[in-house]
């Protein structure tokens, strides 16, 4: 079936000429087209035609997007959307001066959410998570990564991943599952790390890989979570089962996580708030996507990752919400883009590249997603404005008018 999305003011293609990611100065090249309409055949981007040619073009459907702009479907590549309960009490405590780490050391933090997820039934989790996914879709998201990591035992990690799998089967967008059993040690393993690591390696990973429940294995390299040695062991086991690697690293301390990511050829290194100059240079010479999470810095009131240094050193930079109940209770992508521009000195164009093609790179899906290029999937976000700059300029405002997945309109704003 042929469709024409006709008469947009702009098409922001984020064209990569087949490279499928952007690094360094390339982030600013977003492939802007004016005066063209977009032709989609079934689920594939087929062509760009002059607006003046639309009336004579043989097509099955014309979708008028006059006075609007077309972007690639947005991609949120690092989220903890599958959670239950609330941590609003901890938010109050932080406003009174407690740090995120202090709260975690006294039994709060991640383990509070673990308790809530363990209590929740599968049905309760599905009903809780679904409206969050609906909101992402309403913003123009067509691919969404969701991590486990709030079960922290065999039964509940598997429960989380099966819920994520169910949601992926029942939503039009792609929901990419990540196993985050190495998020932190559960209370019952606080004094017996070896037993929990063995559980991850011998039981969880084996079952998850056999049942195809996750694409990635992630882990949190931090003093309050897993050591470098512990994560390396887990990651090597995960790779032996066919899972790709992601790592939470350099959020509060630099413990050597970047070298581990490089050695294991990780898909992405995420957080990087305290990454040092030496590691920035290494990342700039690598194929690893650097996933920055400015919502976390905003929410915790801590320093931001050095986006400018990373870009100036030729790194591949992606952005994500890090949506979670404790350190970034923010699922508003427009807000994250604005924070990245205002606080990390990124250009508007850089934030767009970071939430499209490079976010796709972080999820290893950039060969057919993340940019509007002939032959790629027709995943689109169509915004109700004449200028792409408005998306970042209008802080926190959802300007998405239409979300298109695989050529099909799945959301239209009221």
Which role does the model predict for each range below?
Residues 22-27, 355-357, 377-414:
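C-terminal cap of metal-dependent C-N hydrolases
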Residues 244, 254-371, 383-389, 395, ...:
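Active-site-adjacent C-terminal substructures of enzyme catalytic domains
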Residues 52-71, 76:
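Active-site metal-binding motif and surrounding structural segment of the metallo-beta-lactamase
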Residues 8, 38, 43, 67, ...:
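Divalent metal-coordination and catalytic microenvironments
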Residues 113-128, 134, 142-255:
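Metal-coordinating catalytic core of metallo-dependent amide/deamination hydrolases
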Residues 1-56, 388-390:
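N-terminal metal-binding scaffold of metallo-dependent hydrolase/deaminase domains
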Residues 68-128:
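Metal-associated gating/positioning segment near the N- to mid-region
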Residues 4, 59-64, 177, 403:
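Conserved beta-strand scaffold positions in the cores of enzyme catalytic domains, especially
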């Amino acid at each position: 079936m042929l469709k024409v999305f006709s008469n947009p003011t702009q098409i922001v293609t984020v064209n990569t000429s087949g490279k499928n990611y952007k690094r360094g100065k390339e982030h600013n090249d977003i492939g802007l087209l004016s005066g063209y309409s977009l032709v989609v055949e079934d689920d594939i981007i087929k062509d760009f035609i002059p607006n003046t040619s639309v009336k004579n073009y043989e097509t099955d459907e014309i979708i008028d997007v006059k006075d609007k702009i077309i972007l690639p479907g947005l991609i949120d590549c690092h989220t903890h959307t599958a959670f239950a309960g609330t941590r609003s009490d901890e938010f109050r405590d932080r406003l009174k001066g407690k740090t995120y780490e202090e709260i975690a050391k006294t039994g709060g933090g991640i383990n509070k959410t673990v308790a809530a997820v363990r209590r929740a039934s599968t049905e309760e989790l599905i009903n809780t998570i679904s409206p969050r996914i609906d909101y992402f879709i309403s913003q123009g998201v067509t691919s969404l990564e969701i991590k486990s990591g709030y079960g922290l035992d065999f039964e509940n990690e598997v429960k989380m991943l099966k819920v994520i799998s169910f949601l992926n089967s029942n939503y039009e967008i792609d929901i990419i599952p990540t196993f985050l059993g190495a998020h932190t040690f559960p209370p019952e393993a606080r004094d017996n790390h070896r037993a929990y690591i063995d559980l991850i390696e011998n039981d969880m990973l084996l079952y998850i890989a056999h049942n195809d429940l996750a694409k990635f294995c992630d882990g949190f390299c931090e003093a309050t979570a897993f050591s470098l040695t512990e994560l390396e062991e887990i990651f090597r086991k995960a790779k032996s089962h066919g899972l790709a690697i992601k790592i939470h690293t350099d959020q509060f301390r630099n413990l050597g996580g970047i070298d581990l990511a490089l050695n294991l050829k990780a898909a992405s290194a995420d957080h990087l708030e305290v990454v040092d100059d030496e590691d920035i240079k290494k990342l700039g010479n690598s194929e690893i996507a650097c996933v920055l999470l400015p919502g976390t810095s905003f929410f915790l009131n801590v320093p931001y990752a050095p986006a400018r240094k990373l870009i100036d050193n030729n790194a591949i930079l992606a952005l994500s919400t890090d949506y979670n109940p404790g350190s970034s209770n923010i699922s508003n992508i427009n807000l994250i883009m604005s924070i990245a521009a205002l606080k990390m000195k990124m250009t508007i164009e850089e934030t767009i590249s970071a939430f499209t093609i490079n976010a796709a790179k972080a999820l290893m899906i950039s060969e057919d997603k993340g940019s509007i290029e002939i032959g790629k999937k027709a995943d689109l976000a169509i915004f109700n404005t004449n200028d792409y700059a408005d998306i970042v300029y209008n802080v926190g405002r959802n300007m998405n008018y239409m979300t298109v997945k695989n050529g099909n309109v799945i959301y239209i704003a009221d």
